């Protein structure tokens, strides 16, 4: 009996030690992951706060001056081209490109994402209502930057394997000749594929999974499977199917969300004047608003407002030129004018409406942020339907972004490896969408932000190097 007891204790001790080793490995992995996430977040903060915010805004100011406030002089042209080309059933995209409206819709599909809902709420909590003013400022100058991007994308587009294509990877090579230009183009393509095609789409899938789980109690894995299947079906149809979906989805989702916001603002009409007072006052004198967001400085309002504007409309990041390159237009300036409208719709319409709903709700100082704050603000007017409304909008916004980002990644994947491997890229993206719906994606968010910043650097350098080309084309505009 003593012998058997001794063997049992020894076995238990051995098993316990093995369990300890397994636990040590798991716990060590968690600590390493947390530490790595923190390192990436700190690197991303340094990249964005000390380089990109100044470079992006500075580039916008530079092009605004060089192009003589093109965002104002070409705005009417953009509106005219928008209504001239608007159609929910336009001619199908083909090897020669797509219609100007389809290109704009694909660009806006990427621009108008979950950041217009959750990101706006986070910016207002962190930077106060005054952050919206600085979002407007960054978007105003960003219009000039995105005009330059679209013009260059049109100018340096090319044909690969019988399909018209273009984007920063192509005009970067034109800006910087030789090995350096090739290196920057490859660097940009790799950063974009990682930031948008893979990790970015993982985050978008996660946003949809969270929204539907919170609103309806649906299992996140089920949501991921449905989104992945829908995405795969559209991906397999190529640019033709993506353009056909975005030209219908973007106007419908924008109108649906705008109507919801307008209803709330009509109900809260008496609070709108004070909301604008807060926006303009808190942008310069945060301490002047009693009972407002405590401890928010002018610097914080500026930082979070500018960052949200740049993240939202993507002007200067080098993403939307891939769509604008495919537009069938008479001259590059026409698509440049339409690109300006994309920033206007994203920031001055949709994001601004979200901000006004949040500010007039009076909930910003209540300690909530992100999706929770937005859902609470909409629920004040819509009741329990508020969560459902936001979940539906998150589905529209995030799924449209998945389509846009997939396409941008595909262009760069094909530039690196050739179109014969497109299905491999599609499969990888679908897997990331499926996995992302149910995972905690803090590290993925951090990596996506970091690579987003990295891809912007060569794009902005190329824009500045080719500024003379942009100015020359802008001067030669024909009515």
Which residues make up each language-model segment?
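Membrane-interface loop-to-helix entry segments
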Residues: 10, 55-59, 70-79, 188, ...
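N-terminal alpha-helical transmembrane segments of multi-pass membrane transport
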Residues: 25-109, 114, 125-130, 142, ...
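Selective recognition of specific alpha-helical transmembrane segments in multi-pass small-molecule
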Residues: 141-149, 225-239, 250-270, 303, ...
């Amino acid at each position: 009996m003593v012998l058997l007891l001794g063997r049992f204790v020894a076995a238990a001790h051995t098993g316990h030690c093995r369990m300890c080793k397994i636990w040590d490995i798991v716990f060590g992995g968690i600590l390493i992951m947390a530490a790595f996430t923190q390192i990436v977040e700190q690197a991303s903060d340094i990249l964005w706060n000390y380089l990109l915010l100044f470079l992006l805004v500075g580039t916008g100011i530079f092009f605004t001056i060089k192009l003589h406030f093109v965002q104002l002089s070409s705005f009417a042209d953009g509106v005219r081209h928008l209504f001239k080309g608007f159609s929910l059933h336009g001619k199908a995209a083909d090897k020669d490109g797509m219609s100007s409206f389809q290109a704009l819709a694909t660009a806006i599909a990427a621009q108008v994402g979950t950041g217009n809902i959750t990101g706006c709420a986070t910016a207002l909590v962190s930077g106060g209502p005054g952050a919206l003013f600085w979002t407007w400022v960054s978007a105003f100058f960003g219009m000039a930057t995105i005009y330059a991007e679209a013009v260059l994308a049109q100018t340096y587009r090319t044909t690969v394997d019988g399909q018209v294509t273009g984007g920063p990877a192509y005009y970067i090579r034109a800006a910087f000749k030789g090995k350096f230009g090739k290196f920057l183009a490859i660097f940009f393509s790799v950063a974009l594929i990682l930031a948008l095609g893979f990790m970015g789409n993982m985050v978008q899938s996660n946003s949809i999974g969270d929204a539907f789980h919170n609103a309806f109690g649906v299992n996140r894995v089920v949501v991921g499977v449905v989104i992945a299947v829908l995405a795969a079906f559209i991906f397999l149809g190529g640019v033709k199917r993506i353009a056909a979906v975005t030209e219908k989805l973007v106007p419908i989702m924008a109108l649906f969300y705008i109507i919801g916001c307008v209803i709330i603002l009509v109900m809260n009409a008496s609070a709108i004047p004070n909301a604008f007072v807060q926006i303009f006052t808190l942008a310069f004198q945060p301490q002047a608003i009693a009972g407002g967001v405590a401890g928010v400085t002018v610097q914080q309002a500026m930082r979070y407002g500018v960052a949200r504007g740049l993240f939202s409309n993507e002007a200067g990041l080098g993403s939307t030129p891939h769509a604008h390159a495919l537009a069938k237009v008479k001259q590059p300036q026409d698509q440049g004018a339409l690109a300006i409208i994309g920033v206007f719709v994203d920031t001055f319409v949709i994001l601004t409406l979200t901000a006004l709903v949040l500010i007039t709700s009076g909930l910003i100082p209540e300690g909530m942020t992100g999706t929770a704050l937005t859902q609470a603000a909409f629920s004040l007017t819509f009741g329990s339907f508020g969560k459902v409304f936001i979940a539906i909008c998150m589905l529209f916004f995030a799924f449209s972004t998945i389509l846009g980002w997939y396409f941008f990644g595909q262009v760069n994947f094909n530039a690196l490896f050739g179109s014969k491997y497109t299905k491999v890229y599609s499969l990888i993206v679908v897997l990331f969408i499926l996995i992302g719906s149910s995972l905690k994606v803090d590290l993925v968010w951090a990596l996506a932000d970091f690579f987003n910043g990295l891809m912007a650097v060569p794009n902005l350098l190329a824009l500045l190097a080719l500024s003379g080309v942009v100015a020359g084309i802008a001067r030669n505009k024909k009515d």
